[in-house]
Amino acid sequence: MHNISKDVRRATRDLDLDFIKYSLADDAIINFISKLNKVNDGIIITIIGNIEKLHHQDYDGKRLNISLKDNYNNIIDTKLDIGVNKFLELEQEEMCFDLSMLDNEITLLANSCEQIFSEKLKSLLKFGIRSTRYKDIFDFYYLIKNKKLDKEKLIKCFDILIYKDDTMNENNIEDIIKRLDGIFNNVGYRKILGQANNNWLGLSVDEVTDFVIIYFKSLSKLSV
């Protein structure tokens, strides 16, 4: 979200990658990091400790604690979570980096705004008022308000990520709206939403949640 909004309040140090047609085995991951270090871009990546298996919520993958060091000896310690992209039918945005030093070509793809929105929504629908990803609600508002979303692409993402997932209870926009209404009208949840550390837009909770619901109602005409 920081890359989209350019707002420091949505910045994070943690990194996430999904492999496409590449093994998640530890030795394959170590080889991948080794290849990146051969790019000669002035940054060296060091894996700290053991590679951990991740299995939480609806995510399976591996976690690496890594250290990034540049030519000026600046060091940043962070986490890198690596999963597998299971949704190849979703359109991705290609990111260009000079990786010509590598023997084999690597293409980095970024999730579209529609996929980012849909994955945040899926998590909220699944966990309801138990979800602790409060900033996601304000992310919804930002993406909608700033016209970052294509409605047709968004509906396609809903279909693939939510409607066709047997673990989800929502099969259409009406189901989503009903679920969101229940979440947004929970007094305890709304109180936490309003806290300054969650409300990165500095707007009233009423304005944000009402705006999001209105947008979802506008999608009902486009539902698959």
Regions found by a protein language model. Give the residues of each.
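Structured mid-to-C-terminal alpha-helical surface segments
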Residues: 3-9, 19-224
